[in-house]
Amino acid sequence: MREERPIIALDFPSFEEVKSFLSLFPADERLYVKIGMELYYAEGPDIVRYVKSLGHSVFLDLKLHDIPNTVKSTMAVLSRLGIDMTTVQAAGGVEMLRAAREGLGQGPILIAVTQLTSTSEEQMREDQNIQSTLLASVLHYAKRTAQAKLDGVVCSAHEVKAIKSEVPAGFVCLTPGIRPTGADIGDQKRVMTPHQARAIGSDYIVLGRPITQATDPVKAYHQIKAEWNR
């Protein structure tokens, strides 16, 4: 179920900057955008309602991680915003993941974060005290996520092939850490180009700065979209 539109990360701190950025695109162009913690905590549910009013799809990336009942009730609130996708932390455990699914319902896509693409194996071992390999940790989280009946995971594109060999068909992999050829990788440590991500089986890709900080964001978006779909 590969999504043809790259997801644009709206990594802006304010409503006005989002409005200014989205106004660059033709009114009839339907985008898929990511609203993360900074923007959501600054502007609240109104930013989601505004973006949805323009006809765009919304990936609300809040990475919930709390006791099951709290996650369930929070997801029920988020479901009323009409979001298309959202996230929880796989480390919260199967019970929490199932509670998230119950609270959100069956409409929106619900995916779990495995290991952040900014995390190296050394950091994982030192900071999380997980002494396996990074891939083994990601695969463990992916299998537990599938067991909880979620739709998929957030992972590095480097891990997609291994994940899909371990989970049921239709399990989706959303991959951040995507950069066009020659672009600055920023704080990401495990990156791929859009074309490489497609070839390896990614279903969704997320990009922020290569589009939002481009001299011509609309042109940059369409170039990346063309690379993703070729």
From Swiss-Prot:
It comes from the Bacteria. The gene is pyrF. Its EC number is 4.1.1.23. Keywords: Decarboxylase, Lyase, Pyrimidine biosynthesis. NCBIfam families: PRK00230.1, pyrF. Signal peptide: none annotated. Pathway: Pyrimidine metabolism; UMP biosynthesis via de novo pathway; UMP from orotate: step 2/2. The active site is at residue 63. Catalyzes the decarboxylation of orotidine 5'-monophosphate (OMP) to uridine 5'-monophosphate (UMP). It comes from Streptococcus equi subsp. zooepidemicus (strain MGCS10565). The lineage of its organism: Bacteria, Bacillati, Bacillota, Bacilli, Lactobacillales. This is Orotidine 5'-phosphate decarboxylase. Belongs to the OMP decarboxylase family. Type 1 subfamily.
